[in-house]
C-alpha cells in the first residue's frame, strides 16, 4: 500500500508535446510520390510497357495531344497509341523541371512540366492527378509545344494556311 501511495504522490513526468512534421516536409512527401508516378509513366512509354503506362490513368482520364483534334479518353488514347507500343517503343519524354501543387485536402494535385523529347523537341505537359485507393492516378494530361513569342506570327500564318486546306475525305489520311 505504501508503494502505491508513493507512486500516486510522485510528480508525473512531464508529457512531451507530440512532434509535428514541418509543414514543408509534410507537403513535400506527396509531391515526391506524384513526381515518381509521372517519371514512371514517362519511362513506361519509352519501354513500350502499355499496361504500366495506361495503368497510371484513371478510368475516365483525358489526354490532350498537340494537334487540335487530339482529345482522347483513356480508352480512345490507348487504341490510338497501340501501334506505337506494339512496335516496341512508344515515345521518350523526360521531365527537365516540374512544379506540383496540392489541394488543401491532399486528394487532388496539378502540375506542369518541361519535357525533353527527341522527336518533338521541347514540350510542356500539364495535368491533374487524383488519389484513388491510396495511389496517385492521372485524370487529365495536356501535352503542348511551347512556341517562342517571336515566332508566333509565322506559326499563326502557317496554321491559318493549313486550316484553309480542304479536309481529307473519310478514310483518307489526315492532313497532318
Where are these regions (language model features)?
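Bacterial N-terminal signal peptides
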Residues: 1-8
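A mature extracytoplasmic/lumenal domain signature
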Residues: 38, 57-58, 67, 97-99, ...
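Short, well-ordered alpha-helical segments enriched in acidic and aromatic residues
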Residues: 47-60, 64
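Low-complexity, intrinsically disordered terminal/linker segments enriched in charged
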Residues: 132, 140-176
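Mature N-terminal segment immediately following signal peptide/propeptide cleavage
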Residues: 30-46, 54
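Boundary at the C-terminal end of the N-terminal hydrophobic targeting segment
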Residues: 8-14
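N-terminal low-complexity, Pro/Thr/Ser-rich intrinsically disordered segments
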Residues: 18-34
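Surface-exposed, charged secondary-structure patches
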Residues: 63, 76-122, 171-176
Amino acid at each position: 500500500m505504501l508503494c502505491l501511495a508513493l507512486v500516486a504522490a510522485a510528480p508525473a513526468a512531464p508529457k512531451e508535446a507530440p512532434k509535428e512534421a514541418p509543414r514543408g516536409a509534410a507537403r513535400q512527401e506527396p509531391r515526391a510520390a506524384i513526381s515518381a508516378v509521372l517519371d514512371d509513366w514517362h519511362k513506361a512509354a519509352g519501354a513500350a510497357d502499355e499496361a504500366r503506362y495506361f495503368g497510371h490513368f484513371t478510368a475516365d482520364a483525358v489526354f490532350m495531344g498537340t494537334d487540335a483534334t487530339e482529345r482522347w479518353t483513356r480508352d480512345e488514347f490507348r487504341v490510338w497509341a497501340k501501334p506505337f507500343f506494339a512496335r516496341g517503343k512508344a515515345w521518350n519524354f523526360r521531365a527537365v523541371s516540374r512544379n506540383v501543387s496540392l489541394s488543401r485536402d491532399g486528394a487532388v494535385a496539378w502540375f506542369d512540366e518541361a519535357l525533353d523529347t527527341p522527336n518533338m523537341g521541347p514540350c510542356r505537359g500539364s495535368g491533374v492527378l487524383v488519389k484513388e485507393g491510396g495511389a496517385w492516378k492521372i485524370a487529365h494530361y495536356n501535352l503542348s509545344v511551347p512556341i517562342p513569342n517571336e515566332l508566333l506570327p509565322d506559326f499563326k500564318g502557317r496554321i491559318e494556311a493549313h486550316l484553309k486546306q480542304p479536309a481529307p475525305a473519310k478514310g483518307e489520311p489526315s492532313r497532318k
